[in-house]
Curated annotation (Swiss-Prot):
Biological processes per GO annotation: succinyl-CoA metabolic process; tricarboxylic acid cycle
Domain ATP-grasp: 9-244
Protein species of origin: Xylella fastidiosa (strain Temecula1 / ATCC 700964)
UniProt subunit comment: Heterotetramer of two alpha and two beta subunits.
Catalytic activity, reaction form: succinate + ATP + CoA = succinyl-CoA + ADP + phosphate; GTP + succinate + CoA = succinyl-CoA + GDP + phosphate
Name under which the protein is recorded: Succinate--CoA ligase [ADP-forming] subunit beta
UniProt keyword ATP-binding present: yes
List of residues binding substrate: 264, 321-323
Length: 387
């Protein structure tokens, strides 16, 4: 799950990580009130969307007067903003964050993430902050420091200090960085996060470190034990179809192709998309109906797939282990009748009660195209959209 900057900073503050004072606003007048409550300025006004790169899209403004604050907020609120990190999707700006604007002397980069390669929580730090870390890694990799944390020992203070010295920080800043890193480690583990990014982690004119911008992602699989994080979810920033899918316990991801996919099991779903690509097609979605698929869930899955007008065919690929093929067949028949599917439906069934399932489809009177295996199904789906 993704979070807004202001939500990330709330969590940072709870764990003692220095952040500039700030308030959120949903109108230009509220933004002015927020600015006045923070002092005499200057201020930063920042659009709150689930994407980085807001500055280049006009979503971050430096303001010296409350009139400028009002103008900046009015320009952002109620609009949709696309950045180079939003994958071409324009996200609604419903809130702005108004913060104190400190005098920056140096910008650093610091992040915490799960490194699957080393199977560890890993820190990435750089003396080049305020820019994309990917560019730094490509152009000046010597300016990046990495630290893989031993799972048993956890992060030790000396490791944070070592990073600080390599970044060229002064003694006071080295100790501050070490404390920030330890706090981030605790936050990361306490909340089951998958990413924390401070960019920039700035040195202000008083010599202190502050997290001027922050990004966090949490592990969706752990949301059930973090109701306080679930309450922060902003569905307006998410794909409407994916939100509906999650509400129905379906794992759905929108893609750019024209062949809808309905599969049980994430691994088989990914393999299905691969085989479609291998045969020259483009999947329109990833959709895992799960091992406990019911007729109702299959019907909902069809509705989700057909919510996109790009879908020209649907490939249903089911391996009946836990789920029975005859039950899936009943669900497919009911869904096709209820939804009124107008595009070709290709079905491959294998596993428990497969013969009964195929018989139900064959005698349904519906124009359902049977497939012998995954490759045959993919070929027929590709052929259906290229007619």
């Amino acid at each position: 799950m993704n979070f807004h900057e202001y939500q990330a900073k709330q969590l940072f503050a709870e764990y003692g990580i220095p952040v500039p004072a700030g308030r959120i606003a949903s109108s230009a007048d509220e933004a002015v009130t927020a600015a006045k409550s923070l002092g005499n300025g200057p201020w930063m006004v920042k659009a709150q969307i689930h994407a980085g790169g807001r500055g280049k899209a006009g979503g971050v403004k430096f303001c010296k007067t409350t009139d400028e604050v009002k103008q900046a907020a009015a320009t952002m609120l109620g609009t949709k903003m696309a950045t180079y990190q939003s994958a071409g999707v324009a996200l609604p700006v419903n809130l702005v964050l108004v913060t104190e604007a400190g005098e920056i002397t140096k910008e650093l980069y610091l992040s915490v993430l799960v490194d699957r390669g080393t199977r560890s929580i890993t820190y990435i730090a750089s003396s080049e902050g305020g820019v994309d870390i990917e560019h730094v890694a490509a152009e000046t990799p010597e300016k990046i420091q990495t630290l893989n944390v031993d799972f048993v020992e956890g992060l030790q203070p000396y490791q944070g200090r070592d990073i600080g010295f390599h970044l060229g920080l002064e003694a006071k800043q080295v100790n501050q960085l070490s404390k920030i890193m330890i706090s981030l480690y605790q936050l990361f583990n306490d909340k089951d996060l998958s990413l924390i990014e401070l960019n920039p982690l700035a040195i202000l004119s008083n010599g202190d470190l502050y997290a001027l911008d922050g990004k966090i992602n949490s592990d969706d699989n752990a949301t059930f034990r973090h109701k306080e994080l679930a309450a922060m979810r902003d569905k307006t920033q998410e794909d409407e179809t994916e939100v509906l899918a999650s509400e129905n316990d379906l794992n759905y991801v929108t893609m750019d192709g024209n062949i809808g996919c309905m599969v049980n099991g994430a691994g088989l779903a990914m393999a299905t998309m691969d085989v479609i690509k291998l045969n020259g097609g483009e999947p329109a979605n990833f959709l895992d109906v799960g091992g406990g698929a019911t007729k109702e869930r299959v019907t909902t899955a069809f509705k989700l797939i057909l919510s996109s007008n790009k879908v020209k065919a649907i490939f249903v690929n089911i391996f009946g282990g836990i789920v029975r093929c005859d039950m899936i067949a009943e669900g497919i028949i009911a869904a096709v009748k209820e939804v009124g599917v107008k595009v070709p439906v290709i079905v491959r069934l294998e596993g428990t009660n497969v013969d009964a399932g195929k018989q139900l489809l064959a005698t349904s009177g519906l124009a359902i195209i049977p497939a012998d295996d995954i490759n045959d199904g993919a070929k027929k789906a590709v052929a259906a959209v290229t007619v």
